[in-house]
Amino acid sequence: MPLINLRTNVSDAQGSDALLKELSAALASSTGKPESYVMTLLDFGVPMTFAGSNDPCAYVEIKSIGVLTPPEMSDRFCELIKASLGIPKDRIYIGFDDVSASHWGWNGRTFG
């Protein structure tokens, strides 16, 4: 049930499959949830600005049922994105959403 959605104005990069897998493994590790439940989304070339500039930037959404640790996860995912895409950490926003189990559907039902 953990989900990470990364949107960036950076053009499609070589190694996007590797980045998806890195994000998936990092999210599973950060939440303690099985990677078999993790979903990753990666959207390149999104028209976006940060601080009035269209220099490389990113917006990340992380959603899960409980077990979010925003301070640690913010550092971890900013470092991963900086290393993979070269986006400075001060040009990345991350939104965290602790979703109620009754509001997360999968396999024709909800988790709660």
Give the positions of each predicted feature:
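Interaction-mediating elements
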Residues: 1-112
